[in-house]
């Protein structure tokens, strides 16, 4: 009798994706982040669902409903902090996942990579709208500042902003629609993640060497299921440690003050995972230029496959490119730090230099270095 997992229509899909999937024998722990992102998404959807049962998307009651969740709902504080810090874990995994793709040349799978970029935009949009929901000071002013950026779009800008706001300022209509979008987007993200996997399984996984692994494949189960479970346990360990010992470590104290349109906080800044993009936005004095740079800071990822000039796929055997990659990582850490600092000397000039370096590295230095390495190897 044939095994049910190989005959049943639904089980066949699961089997070919997670059990009998041929995987390269040499993929390292950097390949764990895909499954970790899946776990993060599940955690976020589940905790978000339970939060939505008690949350009210009204400007008058939103803040107090979050307080009510933390004080009166059974384990409400746990659900709320798992959701808030789960977002941080989500972005840590996202950045590492993208970094892995850049280092090992996974971007050569064009469809998979482009859907990944789309997913990154969707997750960032979801996180931004989620940050607005508690209706604290930073929620309100963050929403005001970021949505206002759209007014830089010529001709239709101001109409577009009012259309998004549902009025002449960030108010009840804005909060309600942000809640609706924040609820629906994770399910769209889940569907996109399914398509992301579908395209990945068309080609099979890349591996650290960047060479074809067709000659040496192993089944996904038990080898990589066990490996993924270890990653998941470590993720849960870090997340629960964060939630139970210092749940507000990554948050902003200003968000514990109810939103007040008449009082602007001294330093308006987004959550830590947006600070690098925020620093790039602030480094350009012109409003439209800043908005374009902000979008390009993520959209530049979509151009990377076309800037690949090396004859090797991975950076594993390319020391000069490795140096530039780690300079890029250091540059992003610098931008994240600058994004959280006030707009004053010397932070302004550091931010501007780091922003220039970010685009210069990706668009100019890395492709040229790859060509140089080809010549050094007489390829």
UniProtKB/Swiss-Prot annotation:
Transmembrane segments: 33-53, 77-98, 113-133, 178-198, 226-246, 288-308, 320-340, 347-367
GO terms (BP aspect): mitochondrial electron transport, ubiquinol to cytochrome c
Annotated heme b b562 binding sites: 83, 182
Binding residues for heme b b566: 97, 196
One protein family per Pfam: Cytochrom_B_C
Cellular component GO terms, alphabetical: mitochondrial inner membrane; respiratory chain complex III
GO molecular function terms noted in the UniProt entry: metal ion binding; ubiquinol-cytochrome-c reductase activity
Primary localization class, coarse: mitochondrion
Disulfide-bonded cysteines: none
Localization annotation: Mitochondrion inner membrane
Family of this protein: Belongs to the cytochrome b family.
Subunit structure comment from the entry: The cytochrome bc1 complex contains 11 subunits: 3 respiratory subunits (MT-CYB, CYC1 and UQCRFS1), 2 core proteins (UQCRC1 and UQCRC2) and 6 low-molecular weight proteins (UQCRH/QCR6, UQCRB/QCR7, UQCRQ/QCR8, UQCR10/QCR9, UQCR11/QCR10 and a cleavage product of UQCRFS1). This cytochrome bc1 complex then forms a dimer.
Functional description taken from the UniProt entry: Component of the ubiquinol-cytochrome c reductase complex (complex III or cytochrome b-c1 complex) that is part of the mitochondrial respiratory chain. The b-c1 complex mediates electron transfer from ubiquinol to cytochrome c. Contributes to the generation of a proton gradient across the mitochondrial membrane that is then used for ATP synthesis.
Protein name: Cytochrome b
Species per Swiss-Prot/TrEMBL record: Soriculus nigrescens (Himalayan shrew)
Phylogenetic placement of the source organism: Eukaryota, Metazoa, Chordata, Craniata, Vertebrata
């Amino acid at each position: 009798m044939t095994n049910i997992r190989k005959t049943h229509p639904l089980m066949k899909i699961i089997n070919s994706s997670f059990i009998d999937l041929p995987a390269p024998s040499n993929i390292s722990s950097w390949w764990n982040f895909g499954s970790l992102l899946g776990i993060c998404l599940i955690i976020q959807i589940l905790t978000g669902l339970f939060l939505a049962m008690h949350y009210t998307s009204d400007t008058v009651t939103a803040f107090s409903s979050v307080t009510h969740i933390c004080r009166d709902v059974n384990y409400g504080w746990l659900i709320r902090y798992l959701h808030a810090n789960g977002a941080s874990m989500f972005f840590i995994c996202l950045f590492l996942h993208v970094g892995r793709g850049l280092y090992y040349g996974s971007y050569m799978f064009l469809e998979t990579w482009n859907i990944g970029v789309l997913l990154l935009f969707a997750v960032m949009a979801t996180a931004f709208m989620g940050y607005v929901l508690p209706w604290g000071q930073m929620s309100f002013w963050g929403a005001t500042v970021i949505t206002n950026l759209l007014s830089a779009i010529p001709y239709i800008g101001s109409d577009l902003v009012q259309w998004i706001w549902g009025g002449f300022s960030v108010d009840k209509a804005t909060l309600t629609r942000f809640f609706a979008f924040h609820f629906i987007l994770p399910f769209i993200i889940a569907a996109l993640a399914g398509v992301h996997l579908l395209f990945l399984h068309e080609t099979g996984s890349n591996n650290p060497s960047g060479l074809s692994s067709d000659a040496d494949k192993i089944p996904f189960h038990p080898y990589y299921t066990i490996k993924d479970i270890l990653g998941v346990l470590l993720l849960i360990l870090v997340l629960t440690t964060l939630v139970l010992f210092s749940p507000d470590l990554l948050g902003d104290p200003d968000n514990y003050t109810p939103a007040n349109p008449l009082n602007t906080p001294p330093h308006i800044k987004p959550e830590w995972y947006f600070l690098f993009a925020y620093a790039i936005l602030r480094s350009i004095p012109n409003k439209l230029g800043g908005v374009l740079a902000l979008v390009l800071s993520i959209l530049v990822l979509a151009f990377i496959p076309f800037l690949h000039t090396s004859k090797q796929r991975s950076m594993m055997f390319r020391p000069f490119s490795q140096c530039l990659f780690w300079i890029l990582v250091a540059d992003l850490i610098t931008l994240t730090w600058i994004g959280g600092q006030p707009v004053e000397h010397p932070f302004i000039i550091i931010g501007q230099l780091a922003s220039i370096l970010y685009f210069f590295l990706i668009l100019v230095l890395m492709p040229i270095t790859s060509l140089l390495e080809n010549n050094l190897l007489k390829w």
